[in-house]
Structure formats: structure tokens, C-alpha cells
Amino acid sequence: MSLCIGNFDKSILPNSIVEAVTVPQKMYGVKFDGVNSAGVRTYDAARFVWEPSTATKAGKDSFLGIPMFTPRECITEYDTVEGKQKVVAYKGDNGYDTLKASKTGDVMMEFTRFYYYRPSETEWILSPEYIFGFKPAPAFYRDGKLLDKVYVGKYNLGIGYVSQSGVETLSNVDMNTIRTNLRSKGMYMWDLKWWETLKMLCLVKYANCDVQACNSAGYNSGDRTYPSGNADNVRGLDGSNTSIATNEACLTFGIENAYGNVWKFMDGVFCNDYYLYFKEVSEITNDPTSVADLSVYDKMANNIAVGGNNAELKTLTFNTDYDYITAPQTFGDGPYNDYYWGQSGLRECLVGGDAWLGGSGGLFVFAVHRAVGIADVNYGSGVMWY
């Protein structure tokens, strides 16, 4: 071993190594106190500002232009030769508006990989690059592979199993049927990996864990299956047509009605007696029909909140093996203003709430009280592919 004394000549190193050790790595964080809904942005996000947009005014958005915070709207179609979805056009391309208006393909939001570190229940730090101790955001690590992009439906899954503007939301269909129809076109239902990834982005950008109070109340009363496209005129990635408090369609990172409207089935996760069981969505063809079927699933070591049916959630799970999961840990008065439903037995997982939930919907509302195989007019799905 040789000893280097004095100034080190960096010219002998490859440019990639020099850049890695000399360019500060970006980190965008947020920290909450566990009592108040509003948090404090940290690191490179400390001086950032954000306000939701409306149909007449673009909001303030310091995050705009940073790839991980700026998903791209695009249209994708199923390639029958290669057996997978492909991007055919991005918003802004010539002919894009014509394709969208003619309901060609599916309208998706293209999200870019990032990494996260969650030091505690109430703190998140995100980075576009790998930093020691950080992990890939869960949506971007699947089947043992690191993904550059994930494509998420801009709209709730509509009748005809599409993500398109001006289509009635699909509901009253069970998970097996939805899963089968989406697989035939190279797509998946939303899963908890994606939902938790979206939460991370929202928490840092909004610096608030009550999205109905800071972004939009969304559809929180009335018809649960409004047609899609009612937020198409919002002049930004987040917000709603008129105001935060109005009962109307909303955008969250370009996704319409990510919460409210209809409950969203979560694939890849099931609950039994308050324990969560996980499996890659690519490996699931049918719902488990008995507890014995869960033997091939991974199990989170600690249980989520026991009981508490129709109760406000107070604290979130913080499990070192599944530190991206933010399921209810305890219930009572808390900063999230979201509700939790839980019952023992084999249950499906639903998130987001529906148009009947009022001010109790949002990113953290969580339900594991309905039996596997349920179909309900209040239940629908999101769509994604990778």
C-alpha cells in the first residue's frame, strides 16, 4: 500500500468519480412534529415555496423542473409484438392533443426514480441520486430490478379499463377482474409501493400531511364516480379548478383524484388480523382465498393499529424492514385528519377515501375492513406500468 502525502492530483481520476466527490448531492427533506399538520422543509428544499394552482392561475412551485418532482404527461399504447406498453407521445409533442382527444391509448404520468431516507416516523429526505444509507423509492425497485421510470395513470381507471379524459370511473368490480383486464394490456393496479412513493413526494413538496387542507379537498361529497377530465384545465401539477375548499376534481402531481372520488384497491398487499403481507404485483394473478395462501407473501413484523374501525389515525408505522410503509399505528387525535377502518380476518387494503368521506380522506386514510373479493360501487382502481 502506498501513502499519498500532499495535494492530490484529481486529473488522474475519471470525470464520473470527480463529479461524484466534488458536486454536492441534492437532498430535499421535510420534518413534522407529530402534532401539527404543517411541517418544515429541510436541506435543499428549505427555502422552497409551493402553492396549489387553479384553472385561472398557476400556483407557486419551486420544485418545478426537478425531474423527480416534475412528472411528464404522456400517452402510451400496448405493443402487441413486444407484449408491453410503450410511450407514443409526450404532452407538447405535435399531435399530442389530437391523440388525447381521440382517446388513443392511455394518458399516463411518467415519474423518474429517486431515493429516500426516513430517519423517523415523521421525517423524510429524498434525493435524485444515490446517497449512502438511502434506498430507492419503493415504486422504482421491483422484481429485484432498479427502474428508471414508472408510469401512472393520470386518471382513475375508467370504464373500458382505460386512463382517459371524459370517461366514467370504473367501480363495483372486484380486484381479480380488474387485475386480469389490466394484465392483458401490460398494466397493473396501483400497489402500496406506488402509493407510498407518491406520499413521499407530496409530503416534501406540500410540507403538510393533510392534503385536503393544503392542496384540495377533492371530491368529498356527492356522486362517487364523477367522469374523468374535470381537472384538465388546472394550470399546474397540483390543485383544483377554483379553490382548496371546493368539492371538485383535483390534481396531485398531475394525477386526477388520487384521493377522494372512489376508494382505490391496493394490489400486492393484503391484511390478516392486522398484519400486512406483501408480494410483487407481477407475481399475483389472483387474490388469496385463505390465510394459507399468504405463506408465499412477506410479512411485516409489527402489526398495524388493532381495531379502531372508523377512527382517526394518530401515528404511523415505522418498521425498519418496511420503513416506506406509513400505515396506521395508533388512532386518536392526530395531525393527518384522515380516518382508519380495520377488522380482523383476511382483508383487502383500500386507500384515499371516496366522495362520501368528507374531510376525512387523503393520503393517509387507510381501510382493511372489507373481505377479499369484494366489489362495491365506492371502490375503484388506479393504473400503472413499468
Walk through the language-model features, giving the residues of each:
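Short, low-complexity N-terminal tether/leader segments at secretion or assembly junctions of large
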Residues: 1-20
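Short aromatic-cysteine micro-motif
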Residues: 98, 102-105, 131-258, 262
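Acidic glycine-/aspartate-rich tracts in secreted/extracellular proteins
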Residues: 114-116, 156-158, 194, 269-270, ...
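A solvent-exposed, charged loop/short amphipathic helix patch at secondary-structure junctions
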Residues: 157-176, 276-300
